[in-house]
């Protein structure tokens, strides 16, 4: 995915380990950006790992070391995407429910036109929808995100092993995210502007969370410390 690199500084006080890590990040970003450009030009299924390596000026093994799965060359926000909801719940304020924290986060993501809820541009959106492999990988992302959210909710509510409630809550809360993501991509492919999509999503988010409020409004409220 084409994500702008953060500004790099010429700070000579950076430790050697920091320089190595920065170099790794630059290499990773170069590979991902190069691959995405090739995929946009020729289609996901028509580009090989070897061709990506040549275009990025790295060894084929370097590509697979950074991205063991070809799909992740495109979907390179794995940790942010799958762990984001659990992190929001974990970091919410005292007195705040999981429902309220996630509602605020979804509203902010829609307002900021965040890639995590599907904003990407028409070419990239078509790339996602045209490839069964990418559709399948996105489904895995959604499923993993719900598992991580369920585990966090279970920990927050001191649930017994095998308790079903955290899984149901995670499915409902994660399901809103899945629906928002799919709606954003669909509307983007159809040519709707990001601003218009953002406004529509805001309405959907409020509607969805008002529907969930009676059942989850008092669930997983962060106790005061």
Predicted regions and their residues:
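Basic, helix-initiating cap at the start of DNA-binding domains
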Residues: 1-58, 75, 84
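C-terminal peripheral helix-coil segments that are non-catalytic and often amphipathic
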Residues: 1-11, 151, 182, 186-225
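Alpha-helical transmembrane segments of multipass membrane proteins
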Residues: 177-178
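Short hydrophobic/aromatic patch on the recognition helix
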Residues: 58-67
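Amphipathic alpha-helical packing segments from all-alpha helical-bundle domains
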Residues: 132-158, 164-168
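Hydrophobic alpha-helical connector segments
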Residues: 76, 83-124
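Alpha-helical DNA-contacting segments of helix-turn-helix folds
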Residues: 26, 72-81, 141-142
């Amino acid at each position: 995915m084409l994500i702008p690199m953060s500004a790099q500084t010429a700070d000579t006080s950076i430790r050697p380990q920091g320089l190595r890590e920065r170099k790794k990040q630059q290499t990773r970003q170069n590979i991902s950006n190069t691959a995405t450009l090739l995929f946009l030009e020729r289609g996901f299924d028509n580009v090989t790992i070897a061709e990506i390596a040549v275009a990025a000026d790295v060894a084929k093994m370097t590509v697979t070391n950074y991205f063991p799965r070809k799909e992740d060359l495109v979907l390179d926000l794995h940790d942010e995407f799958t762990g984001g909801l659990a992190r929001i719940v974990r970091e919410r304020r005292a007195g705040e429910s999981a429902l309220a924290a996630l509602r605020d986060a979804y509203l902010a993501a829609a307002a900021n036109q965040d890639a995590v809820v599907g904003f990407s541009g028409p070419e990239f959106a078509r790339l996602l929808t045209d490839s069964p492999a990418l559709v399948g990988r996105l489904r895995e992302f959604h499923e993993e995100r719900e598992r991580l959210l369920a585990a966090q909710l279970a920990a927050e509510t001191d649930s017994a092993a095998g308790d079903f409630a955290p899984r149901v809550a995670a499915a409902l809360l994660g399901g809103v995210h899945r629906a928002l993501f799919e709606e954003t991509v669909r509307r983007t492919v159809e040519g709707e502007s990001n601003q218009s999509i953002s406004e529509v999503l805001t309405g959907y988010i409020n509607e969805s969370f008002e529907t969930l409020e009676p059942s989850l409004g008092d669930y997983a409220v962060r106790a005061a410390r």
